[in-house]
A protein has these predicted regions:
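A short, charged helix-loop
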Residues: 130-160
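Residue-level signal for inorganic ion chemistry
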Residues: 10, 64, 86, 128, ...
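Conserved beta-loop-beta/alpha segment of the NTase-like Rossmann-fold superfamily
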Residues: 46-134, 177-182
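Left-handed beta-helix
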Residues: 171-354, 358-376, 382-388, 402-403, ...
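A conserved mid-domain beta-alpha-beta active-site/ligand-binding segment of alpha/beta enzyme cores
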Residues: 154-174, 180
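Acidic donor-binding segment of Leloir-type glycosyltransferases
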Residues: 36-46
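Short, acidic, metal-binding catalytic loop of nucleotide-sugar glycosyltransferases
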Residues: 16-23
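Short, small-residue-biased leader/transition segments that mark boundaries at the very start
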Residues: 2-9
Length: 415
């Protein structure tokens, strides 16, 4: 999803959760690379739990539950709601979440989830097949789950009254910590996070929901779209192009989101989604866009663009020479009044060339003022930091035999 679009939906969900009074507190579970982006979007008052590595929804929910239990010391009777952070929906969705939480509170079932009334047969979603209504309250016991069936099976499931699995779950905290303990026996959050790789790489649906002995579903019949695929996301865009894009009049049902400075030209394209960012370029038939995750997991490379609390950076160039010597070039922007940490590297040298703005530089506890045109060489082993007096832009060239984000030691520094 485009960063700008993601900002809007996440902030909207947090606002609606607060307005409906469903939650006493909100915690966001995400990857390490998304941490600063989330903080920039939602503010520092919302805790962010980061996965050490990407391992699917069960490990992520297990880690977040462990954080609440062992770090925040929440009661095992606390009702936990798990939901995606960017649904496209309406107010009734959040009222249904309240009903899900109430169902757990009233001990209707140990695990309660939201079922979306399907509007058409789809192979994109998992299905929840209900049985009898619990005391005629519009809460159904679950007969079985079917994960992403073919179209013929999907039609049959809908005829049986099945719901789409909306990815919203509620349970008591102790229910989840008992499951966590089966995999990692400890009561400290730090140990669970350090042993995160011991969790199976599997979805919450497969590992928990489908194995649950006591599970119920609360239906939601309002407007809902899963914006987890480009096909559904582009349906909500008011324009077919965003960014530097030229598209001819013969192109049909094509959406282009371009976050790069380079132009994208589309001539006679049909039913495509094209998304370009510093991390890569996606070109997909819209009807196949749900398969992106299968191939994206194969792309294990460092992020080429990251938002941080102090600003942002993008990787401009990387190189490796015949003798193993490497270089990496970044462009960094630091917001006015913000600073990067006081730090040292053991395996690389850096050269900073300031191209806009004014700031304060610290090298081994010695301060100086820097501005456009200044170039600073920072040898390995030298402590360094910079603070922006006005928005500061500079080019950083790293060089050495080992260039790794982990090559950093941070220190406290008072400006």
């Amino acid at each position: 999803m485009s960063r700008g679009l993601g900002d809007v939906y996440k902030r909207q969900v947090v606002r609606q959760l607060r307005e409906t009074g469903i939650c006493d507190s909100i915690t966001v579970a995400t990857s390490q690379s998304q941490r600063d982006i989330i903080i920039n979007q939602l503010g520092e008052e919302i805790p962010v739990v980061t996965e050490p590595e990407r391992r699917d929804t069960f490990p992520a929910i297990a880690l977040a539950s462990s954080y609440l239990a062992y770090k925040r010391k929440c009661s095992t009777d606390e009702i936990i709601i798990v939901m995606p952070c960017d649904p496209y929906t309406e107010t009734g969705y959040f009222e249904t979440i309240r009903r899900i939480a109430d169902a757990v509170k009233n001990n209707v079932a140990e695990l309660v989830l939201m079922g979306i009334n399907p509007t058409y047969p789809s192979a994109k979603y998992g299905y929840v097949v209900p049985v009898n209504d619990v005391q005629n309250k519009g809460i159904f016991q679950v007969s079985r789950f079917t994960e992403k069936p073919d179209m013929i099976t999907a039609e049959k499931l809908i005829s049986e009254g099945a719901f789409w699995n909306g990815g919203v779950f509620a349970f008591r905290l102790g229910y989840m910590t008992d499951i966590v303990t089966r995999h990692i026996k400890t009561d400290t959050f730090s140990e669970i996070r350090s042993r995160y790789g011991e969790f199976p790489k599997i979805s919450f649906d497969y590992e928990v929901a489908e194995k649950a002995q006591s599970v119920a579903v609360v239906p939601f019949a309002g407007e809902w779209k899963d914006l987890g695929t480009w096909n559904t996301l582009t349906d909500e865009l008011s324009e077919h192009t965003m960014g530097n894009v030229v598209m001819d009049e013969e192109s049909e049902n094509t959406h282009v989101i371009n976050e790069l400075g380079l132009p994208i030209m589309c001539i006679g394209t049909r039913n495509l989604v094209i998304a370009a960012s510093n991390d890569g370029i996606l070109i997909s038939d819209k009807d196949k866009s749900e398969n992106i995750k299968t191939y994206a997991d194969c792309l294990q490379h460092r992020p080429m663009f990251e938002e941080r609390r102090w600003g942002e950076y993008k990787v401009v160039d990387t190189a490796e020479f015949s003798d193993g010597y490497k270089s990496l070039t970044k462009q960094l922007k630091i917001k006015s009044g913000k600073s990067i940490s006081y730090q040292v590297h053991r395996h690389r040298d850096e050269v900073w060339t300031f191209i806009d703005g004014e700031g304060e530089l610290v090298l081994d506890d010695i301060r100086s003022v820097i501005s456009r045109g200044d170039t600073i060489t920072i040898k390995k082993g030298v402590k360094h930091a910079v603070r922006a007096i006005s928005e500061l832009t500079f080019i950083e060239v790293q060089s050495g035999n080992l260039l790794a984000e982990e090559d950093i030691e941070q220190f406290d520094y008072k400006w």
